[in-house]
């Protein structure tokens, strides 16, 4: 899980999801998981 100020989709499988006010990127590739913080 990468914690970044700006989260972006890295590949076409990435999805941007908002959970409890936190923006996250989910993907089939574990390296692409991110959250904003």
From Swiss-Prot:
PROSITE patterns: RIBOSOMAL_L36
Pfam families tied to this protein: Ribosomal_L36
GO cellular component, one term: ribonucleoprotein complex
Coiled-coil ranges per UniProt: none
Alphabetized UniProt keyword annotations: Ribonucleoprotein, Ribosomal protein
The keyword Ribosomal protein is annotated on this UniProt entry: yes
One GO BP annotation of this record: translation
Molecular function terms, GO-annotated: structural constituent of ribosome
Family to which this protein belongs: Belongs to the bacterial ribosomal protein bL36 family.
Name listed for the protein in its UniProt record: Large ribosomal subunit protein bL36
Species of provenance: Colwellia psychrerythraea (strain 34H / ATCC BAA-681) (Vibrio psychroerythus)
């Amino acid at each position: 899980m990468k914690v970044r100020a700006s989260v972006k989709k890295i590949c076409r499988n990435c999805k941007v999801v908002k959970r409890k006010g936190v923006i996250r990127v989910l993907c089939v590739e574990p390296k692409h998981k991110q959250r904003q913080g």
